[in-house]
Amino acid sequence: MKSLQIICLLFIFVARGSCRSCEICHNVGNDCGYDYVEECHSPEDQCGKVFLEISSAPLSIRSIHRNCFSSSLCKLEHFDVNTGQETYLRGRIHCCDEEKCEGRPFPGLPLSHPNGYVCPGVLGLFSEDSSESEAACKGDETKCINIVGYRKERFPGDIAYNIKGCVSSCPELRLSNRTHEERRNDLIKVECRDAVKITPSE
């Protein structure tokens, strides 16, 4: 069941998309098994390629997405969220002006140790409210991120998600404009704050 949730979660972050045509594909793994070209709709005005990875020791699953993206999403470029319990959600975004964008592969996870900061940690799917645990921040992770939203699909319907964890910096994410496109990824909460420093007990 956990593996199924991880695979589903990989697909909900990529919203569909100015008169531009881009290559479209969604696949688990590092390569697209199929693709087709589709005209984009405003505000998704750039072609892009996204690698997503959820690693939850010892399981690691990657997916690839080529699609139409908004310029605001393209500016994000990459993200790494430590949701606790040795689980990471990672993404690499590359946009271009051509139908088929080629991005750089994932770097390996850095070897880092807890730095004394903590954040609430959640990697939840199918619900905006999920039980949270404490995420021990590592390396240069000193910020806490909280993202809640849903992916609207014709089938199986709206997929809610809730993500909390440690990040090294606050991403430039904005709440979605719900006035466009029938199939979309809607952010309904984006919060980022300083992590809490744990004082060692004497």
UniProtKB/Swiss-Prot annotation:
<feature type="disulfide bond">
    <location>
        <begin position="74"/>
        <end position="95"/>
    </location>
</feature>
<dbReference type="Pfam" id="PF00021">
    <property type="entry name" value="UPAR_LY6"/>
</dbReference>
<dbReference type="GO" id="GO:0005576">
    <property type="term" value="C:extracellular region"/>
</dbReference>
<feature type="disulfide bond">
    <location>
        <begin position="170"/>
        <end position="192"/>
    </location>
</feature>
<feature type="disulfide bond">
    <location>
        <begin position="22"/>
        <end position="47"/>
    </location>
</feature>
<protein>
    <recommendedName>
        <fullName>Phospholipase A2 inhibitor gamma subunit A</fullName>
    </recommendedName>
</protein>
<keyword id="KW-0593">Phospholipase A2 inhibitor</keyword>
<comment type="subunit">
    <text>Heteromer composed of subunit A and subunit B.</text>
</comment>
<feature type="disulfide bond">
    <location>
        <begin position="119"/>
        <end position="144"/>
    </location>
</feature>
<feature type="disulfide bond">
    <location>
        <begin position="137"/>
        <end position="166"/>
    </location>
</feature>
<dbReference type="Pfam" id="PF02988">
    <property type="entry name" value="PLA2_inh"/>
</dbReference>
<dbReference type="GO" id="GO:0019834">
    <property type="term" value="F:phospholipase A2 inhibitor activity"/>
</dbReference>
<dbReference type="InterPro" id="IPR016054">
    <property type="entry name" value="LY6_UPA_recep-like"/>
</dbReference>
<feature type="signal peptide">
    <location>
        <begin position="1"/>
        <end position="19"/>
    </location>
</feature>
<dbReference type="InterPro" id="IPR004126">
    <property type="entry name" value="PLipase_A2_inh_N"/>
</dbReference>
<comment type="similarity">
    <text>Belongs to the CNF-like-inhibitor family.</text>
</comment>
<feature type="disulfide bond">
    <location>
        <begin position="96"/>
        <end position="101"/>
    </location>
</feature>
<keyword id="KW-0964">Secreted</keyword>
<dbReference type="InterPro" id="IPR045860">
    <property type="entry name" value="Snake_toxin-like_sf"/>
</dbReference>
<keyword id="KW-0732">Signal</keyword>
<comment type="function">
    <text>Inhibits the enzymatic activity of the phospholipase A2 (PLA2).</text>
</comment>
<feature type="disulfide bond">
    <location>
        <begin position="40"/>
        <end position="68"/>
    </location>
</feature>
<dbReference type="InterPro" id="IPR016338">
    <property type="entry name" value="PLipase_A2-inh_b-type"/>
</dbReference>
<dbReference type="InterPro" id="IPR050918">
    <property type="entry name" value="CNF-like_PLA2_Inhibitor"/>
</dbReference>
<feature type="disulfide bond">
    <location>
        <begin position="25"/>
        <end position="32"/>
    </location>
</feature>
<keyword id="KW-1015">Disulfide bond</keyword>
